[in-house]
Amino acid sequence: MFKSSKKEDSSKKNHNNKLIFAIRKLFSPIKNFFRQTKTPDNFFGVIKRLKINNQKMTLDECNIFANLLKIKDKTIADIMVPRSDIAAIKLTTNLEELSESIKLKVLHARTLIYDGTLDNVVGFIHIKDLFKAFATKQNGCLKKLIRKHIIAAPSMKLLDLLTKMRRERTHIAIVVDEYGGTDGLVTIEDLIEEIVGRIDDEHDQQLDSDNLKVINNSTIILNARVEVEVLEEIIGEKLKNDDEFDTIGGLVLTRVGSVPAIGTRINISENIEIEVTDATPRSLKQVKIRLKNALNSG
């Protein structure tokens, strides 16, 4: 049986909470200072006041703090992905058609779904949900896989959008113009990166085209550094029984005992075969995951 999406939603919620907690903790030494003092808009003025009050910040803290001062005036229009760069799928596309199209074009971790035209976005699908549907041989349209998004105007402040995303518990906002047409999109990762810089998310493992590629309904390609839990969530099968390894590469090395050569195939379970597609003499780089049941049934 495949795992419920409740665990995934809970994991995302916990991850977002941890990120917000980390940002709050980062500024705890100066929290009281801001409550008692009028905050100057000039960054260097703030640093001078902190120095006078014997408050210290690391270089990373200074960079994040500078970004926070800048972001307060930024709007969605400053960072959104424009309409021309949006990748989306028609609502009428069925899973069988999508399985075939994936062979030619790799989807993003989150892909928008529209009804009729891009001006009528109905939500988005996550690539992990899509592969689960393939693995369980689900048929029909994409409606049952769609997750909700929110609507925002280009003029909305970024901090207001971040608050709204947390309240609505969604990761994507569709930006609309004055006529209601789709102008662009913004993800929660875009917002956080405006504050802390580029994030290498060890929980989601940046499930983009660099780390996870769906080839068809029985095959995916994974970066060997992707955590085992990510694969477990996708296929709904427990692969890790202890803390001996964390990544897909660690799983393979534990089973084989050394770095296998390219082309080596390892049976991880009755239903899962891993093939090494990229490796050096010292490390595993990339693997191909095959679901045998799906192959045999096809």
Curated annotation (Swiss-Prot):
CDD domains: CBS_pair_CorC_HlyC_assoc. GO terms for molecular function: flavin adenine dinucleotide binding. Keywords: CBS domain, Repeat. SUPFAM superfamilies: CBS-domain pair, FAD-binding/transporter-associated domain-like. It holds the Pfam family CorC_HlyC. Residues 80-141, 145-202 form the CBS domain. GO terms for cellular component: plasma membrane. SMART domains: CorC_HlyC. Belongs to the UPF0053 family. Hemolysin C subfamily. It is not know if this bacteria is hemolytic. This is Possible hemolysin C. It comes from Rickettsia canadensis (strain McKiel). The lineage of its organism: Bacteria, Pseudomonadati, Pseudomonadota, Alphaproteobacteria, Rickettsiales.
